[in-house]
Amino acid sequence: MNYFELFSLSPSFELDTAVLSERYRELQRAVHPDKFANASEQDKRLAVQHTAQVNDGYNTLKHPISRAEHMLSLKGIDLSHESTTVKDTMFLMQQMEWREALEEISDCDDPDEAIEHLHQSFGEYRGDITAQLAQKIGSEEASVLEQAADLVRKLKFMDKLQAELERAEDALF
């Protein structure tokens, strides 16, 4: 299912989330199962199915990574069940450095500074990757779309690192 069509939005990585939220509320009002309380069993089932589609679509489109995955899937590149890893050795080396820094936080003289430095580093890298992705994901060229897929994989790694950083931060306080 094309969630952009469901929400009457143009397929775009850069999405106005306020418009998305408004369309979500409109669709929910139209298909919510409570509106079909006195309807036939079939209509009730359809309302539940439509509500599930609207919820899935909203959750997919509101998050940049899942939105990018959806856009790629619409172009024939399915990342949802893959085990392909990033092959960019520079990125992998950077990731190893970040993981080492994460492991050393508790032993630092100033863990707050180390955490702040990692937050800043992650944010800058994520911003760069996201900007590149926004440029490439609209392409119709297979090679450019594969580059976009690699950028999505990198963003997934960054999400995992961010979660690890937050756990490390929570463990200190």
Swiss-Prot record:
Superkingdom of this protein's organism: Bacteria
Keyword Chaperone among UniProt keywords: yes
Gene Ontology MF terms: ATPase activator activity; protein-folding chaperone binding
Stored SUPFAM superfamilies: Chaperone J-domain, HSC20 (HSCB), C-terminal oligomerisation domain
Listed GO CC annotations: iron-sulfur cluster transfer complex
Keywords: Chaperone
UniProt GO BP: [2Fe-2S] cluster assembly; protein complex oligomerization; protein folding
SMART domains referenced in this protein's UniProt entry, alphabetically: DnaJ
Domain J residues, every copy: 2-74
Quaternary structure (record): Interacts with HscA and stimulates its ATPase activity.
Described function: Co-chaperone involved in the maturation of iron-sulfur cluster-containing proteins. Seems to help targeting proteins to be folded toward HscA.
Similarity annotation: Belongs to the HscB family.
Name used for this protein in its record: Co-chaperone protein HscB homolog
Organism expressing this protein natively: Shewanella loihica (strain ATCC BAA-1088 / PV-4)
